[in-house]
Amino acid sequence: MAKSKTPAKRARRAEANRLRNKAYKSKLKTAIKNYENAIIAEDLDTASNKLLQVTSLLDRSITKGILHKNNVARKKSALSKKLNSISQ
């Protein structure tokens, strides 16, 4: 553990940020799973609504600094392709 005040505070902040990011990523993964379940059920209306929710969460993760913008772009593209595959 850190001996002086500044590194100790940084360690506390890093842990708090880690837990916050972990919770947000868990929320995001749950939303993606719900979307994929709607895709499997081939429910187009539900899937399109879930895609909007997932896209919103992904975009917010960029702003919060949780995910990189290229990572988010790749995820959004893959999820959109899944929706397009059942809509045809």
UniProtKB/Swiss-Prot annotation:
Purpose: Binds directly to 16S ribosomal RNA.
**Record key words, sorted:** Ribonucleoprotein, Ribosomal protein, RNA-binding, rRNA-binding
Of which family is this protein a member? Belongs to the bacterial ribosomal protein bS20 family.
Question: Its gene?
Answer: rpsT
Native organism taxonomy: Bacteria, Bacillati, Bacillota, Clostridia, Eubacteriales
Q: Which GO terms describe its cellular component?
A: cytosol; small ribosomal subunit
Q: Which Pfam families match?
A: Ribosomal_S20p
Its protein name is Small ribosomal subunit protein bS20
Q: Which GO terms describe its biological process?
A: translation
Under InterPro entries, the record lists: Ribosomal_bS20, Ribosomal_bS20_sf
Recorded superkingdom: Bacteria
